Amino acid sequence: MEGEQDIGVEFLGDYKILCYLRKGLWCQDILAEHRFIKKRYILKLLCSELSSSEAFMTAFHEAIIKLATIRHPGIISIENVSQAEGQYFLVTEEKEVPTLSLAQYLSSCSQGLSELEAKDLICQLAEILDYAHANRLIHGGLSLDSVHIDLTGQSPKVFLPELGFSFLLKDQYTQSLLRDSSEKSSFDKLKQILLFQAPETALGTVAEDVYAFGVIVYFLLFRQLPQGAFPLPSEAFPEYVYDWDRLIQSCLSYAVEKRPKKLAPLLVKKTLGEQFLAAKIQCSEEDLREIEEEPQVPSVANILQKVEDKIIEETSDHLEFVLVEAKSIDEAMNTSVDSKEEVVAEDESYSNALQSLLIREPVVSRYVEEEKEEVKPQPLFTEMVFIEGGKFLRGSREGQRDEHPVHEIFLHSFFLDIHPVTNEQFVRYLECSGSEQDKYYNELIRLKDSRIQRRSGKLVIEPGYAKHPVVGVTWYGASGYASWVGKRLPTEAEWEIASCGGVTQLRYPCGEEIDKSQANFFSSDTTPVMSYPANPYGLYDMAGNVYEWCEDWYGYDFYEISAQESHAPQGPAQGVYRVLRGGCWKSLKDDLRCAHRHRNNPGAVNSTYGFRCAKGVK
């Protein structure tokens, strides 16, 4: 990567620092590798000046919670948030943020952008902002410098690296520019901030993003910012087919309530009438002429009459042959001798009938394609076990701190799948959805970390793995599958009580001890479901094979809260991580305990993560 600075061996928490990357306004980017799982990430180390501000950290924490729950190719993807030696840092995927701002990209395009090129960038930006606003995220600092362009693919892709943080950093950014006020570039940037700022007081609202979006659209079309009584695109570019006037006027409206809530629907073409008028305006008066005489359009009957005359003329030499061939087979087999008058009369009547057939106007009916009902894949259901509700003990005295204290809870009755969802079950869900992402662009499964592959556009399971539990699936994929089959994910409390099999404070699902004949752990791969004995409830693979996603957000101290509010606990109201339970095929024995808690980001992908479904009793 460009700009990397080699350094010696150095650690930041659990991450081995490989090299330093670019330094931004609010963070230092670092390429690092996790010391245990040996996977590379980009760490964003917060500046000490910001991390020491309590007001900033409070707002920053709220933004992180929102960002951690979403996945979009145009928004920074956060895997984790951590702290080491008093330093806060974000853990993001190994993808360096593009360093080419929109201003730099436009300056590199000597010929300017065509309408379609500008429309493509505008459409991407509108779609990202609509997605962010739907998830209660505001940019608050849109400008030519905050919008980045990724040129690594076949076509330019819009990326917003500061989405969620920009509004928090606006004051600091302005102060840094004022410190460098002697430079002309700093003055230009300050001017740009003011021109992209909505006229109302800055509060970090959707309306402010919409206003800045309108300014960006105007700049992409005109290569200048809208100031004063600015001209509209229809005046300068009458040949453009999209209705840019409506978009710009609605976005730049001084009345906040008149600005649109969604941006993507504004990208519409002009009507055919508007396009015709625009084309007419372009034409000079010399090119316009009035049609004084009404053109003589031949009627359909005249055309058919001419065609008929031509056919009769061309076939007159062969008419006798045609008439003989066209007669019925009964007449051809008739060997009786008729009088000459009868033959002539019959031939004349037959000729007249043929001519009337030729001059008949053809009837053309509209072709309507027969609708074929698309047959979508149906789910393969798993047998379920009924678990009667009541009072139970959960937690552990010997485990980690987040398993304390042991406390009593009450659960309603519920059903639980007897084994985790398999590859052959999950592949039907993917075929039905038609994508590896949901409608919010959340990843459902990462195929390269699973045993399901896409070959020639078709999903196939690796040979021998149809009955193995599906892996590489995110929490979103697990939750989506459960909804598809009319079920849900189990709560953490339901999962723990089910793993104990109705026995109070059972250490492992199979008893007080466990060995490799009772569960798949500390091994090299998954095994087919139901390969090991079931627990007392008749549930298989509650220990080992794959970690299983639960419905709950993870809370480190939630057991203390659950001890006070013990009625059907369902986890914290919000959080950064989702709960995982049960250990996996490469876990140590301690991870297989019924009370052991694990967690990860809901969008995290791992070859050890799977799930099973639950259902309430109505």
UniProtKB/Swiss-Prot annotation:
Keywords: ATP-binding, Kinase, Nucleotide-binding, Phosphoprotein, Serine/threonine-protein kinase, Transferase. Its EC number is 2.7.11.1. ATP binds at L21, R22, K23, G24, L25, W26, C27, Q28, D29, K44. Autophosphorylated on serine and threonine residues. SUPFAM superfamilies: C-type lectin-like, Protein kinase-like (PK-like). GO terms for molecular function: ATP binding; formylglycine-generating oxidase activity; protein serine kinase activity; protein serine/threonine kinase activity. Residues 15-381 form the Protein kinase domain. It catalyses: L-seryl-[protein] + ATP = O-phospho-L-seryl-[protein] + ADP + H(+); L-threonyl-[protein] + ATP = O-phospho-L-threonyl-[protein] + ADP + H(+). Together with the serine/threonine kinase PknD, may play a role in the specific interactions with host proteins during intracellular growth. Belongs to the protein kinase superfamily. Ser/Thr protein kinase family. This is Serine/threonine-protein kinase pkn1.
